[in-house]
Amino acid sequence: MNIRPLHDRVVVRRKEEEEKSAGGIVLPGSAKEKPNQGEVVAVGSGRVLDNGETRPVDVKVGDTVVFGKYAGSDTIEINGEELVILSESDIKAIIE
């Protein structure tokens, strides 16, 4: 996949949506919540600071991350796969 996000942007592939609820009920498409976890597939070079230096992002390709519920409104489709473009500040945690 060839995508290179700019600055402190991160491209994430969302985790698969749950097909069933915790109680075993099959969820229709409209009842499913978009997952707020995913795998990092590309990272930008980092944030440019006021002094001109670039601070690299803290995540790397392959990391599994948790992001805010309302983050990820910027989505793109590449090769039939939906990807989310986030700012690094939208990422809440790295799952190790």
Curated annotation (Swiss-Prot):
GO MF annotation: an example: ATP binding
Pfam families, per database record: Cpn10
Recorded GO CC terms: cytoplasm
One of the GO BP terms on file: chaperone cofactor-dependent protein refolding
Entry keyword annotation includes Cytoplasm: yes
Keyword Metal-binding set for record: no
UniProt-annotated location(s): Cytoplasm
Assembly and interaction partners: Heptamer of 7 subunits arranged in a ring. Interacts with the chaperonin GroEL.
Biological function: Together with the chaperonin GroEL, plays an essential role in assisting protein folding. The GroEL-GroES system forms a nano-cage that allows encapsulation of the non-native substrate proteins and provides a physical environment optimized to promote and accelerate protein folding. GroES binds to the apical surface of the GroEL ring, thereby capping the opening of the GroEL channel.
Record-stated family: Belongs to the GroES chaperonin family.
Name the UniProt record assigns to this protein: Co-chaperonin GroES
Species annotation: Teredinibacter turnerae (strain ATCC 39867 / T7901)
Lineage: Bacteria, Pseudomonadati, Pseudomonadota, Gammaproteobacteria, Cellvibrionales
